[in-house]
Amino acid sequence: ALLSFDETTTLFHEFGHALHRIFADGPYDRTSGNVQRDFVELPSQVMEHWAAEAEVMKVYAKHYKTGEVIPAALIEKLEKSGKYGQGFATVEYLAASLLDMDYHVLKEVPANLDAMEFEANVMNKRGLLKQIPPRYRSTYFNHTMGGGYTAGYYSYIWAEVLDADAFEAFKETGDIFNQDK
């Protein structure tokens, strides 16, 4: 398949959700794999680390006609590009998380609520830069308005903390493929 690196990362991410669901052990199928929102993104986001690991990329990142493995120089550039703009991305997620929480502490939604004004007030109240808007705007923020993340969108940022620690445990073994350690 001809996937971009972003698409490959998404594939690994969604595969992490699938593995979590498949290997979750519970008495009832419909509830097995259900965990607190704080944890739900950990299995998927830890899988993203494997997508970006040079050792793993050499297994899947090959030319579709020749089978030539991705050059080490290109892997290095991909690693560097993953760090570029990290502060911007974190603020985007943080802004969306704060917006999500502020929507869910409203006692009632005013009939004349101006979503853009509400967003601006949330960002100003928290001292966030208006140049870096929330990752998702109110008008299409599906996670918080119906995607099951009500007041829990912060779990993506929290999962980054957890998944970095979890993946580091694999790296500390000296072999990220070792199933025994």
Question: Where are the model-predicted features located?
Answer:
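Cation-handling catalytic/transport regions enriched in His/Asp/Glu
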Residues: A1-K181
